[in-house]
């Protein structure tokens, strides 16, 4: 790796440790020429499956879209940003674990609803009402009754 201070290619690793729940490696490096030290982070670049929409169109997985949907459902709920990020991480892991190049938006929606059911039941009902296009109060009641089961 090139030294960011003197641009020479000779650096050595003086310390390595796992961070971010084992998903990243933090390395402390030292330049053999100028002796400056710097930190690098390494993580696997994993390809996310494409999402097949209900109309048959395909689009790349968009983490920002997922985050926005979760935050909308969780608005004014007692759920921390850290919990949301952990939820996103688990959802992405579940998507990759399918081993598929493409997943349906229906499958993704069901994954999200399962995650929200565990995280916050009110947010789950909010998300389900939009995702399942509830038409009237009866459908809300039925979904809430299913939560009690």
Swiss-Prot record:
The keyword Nucleotide-binding applies. It holds the Pfam family ATP-cone. The keyword Zinc applies. Signal peptide: none annotated. Residues 49-139 form the ATP-cone domain. Its cofactor is Zn(2+). Binds 1 zinc ion. One of its GO terms (biological process) is negative regulation of DNA-templated transcription. Negatively regulates transcription of bacterial ribonucleotide reductase nrd genes and operons by binding to NrdR-boxes. This is Transcriptional repressor NrdR. The lineage of its organism: Bacteria, Pseudomonadati, Pseudomonadota, Gammaproteobacteria, Alteromonadales.
């Amino acid at each position: 790796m090139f030294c960011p201070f003197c641009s020479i290619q000779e650096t050595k690793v003086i310390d390595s440790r796992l961070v971010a729940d084992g998903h990243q490696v933090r390395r402390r490096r030292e330049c053999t020429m100028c002796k400056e030290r710097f930190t690098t982070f390494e993580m696997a670049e994993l390809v996310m499956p494409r999402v097949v929409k209900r109309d048959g169109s395909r689009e790349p997985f968009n983490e920002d879209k997922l985050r926005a949907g979760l935050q909308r459902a969780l608005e004014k709920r007692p759920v921390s940003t850290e919990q949301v990020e952990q939820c996103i991480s688990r959802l992405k892991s579940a998507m990759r674990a399918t081993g598929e190049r493409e997943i349906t938006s229906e499958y993704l929606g069901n994954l999200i609803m399962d995650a929200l059911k565990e995280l916050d039941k009110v947010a789950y009902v909010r998300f389900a009402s939009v995702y399942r296009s509830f038409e009237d109060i009866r459908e809300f009641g039925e979904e809430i009754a299913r939560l009690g089961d």
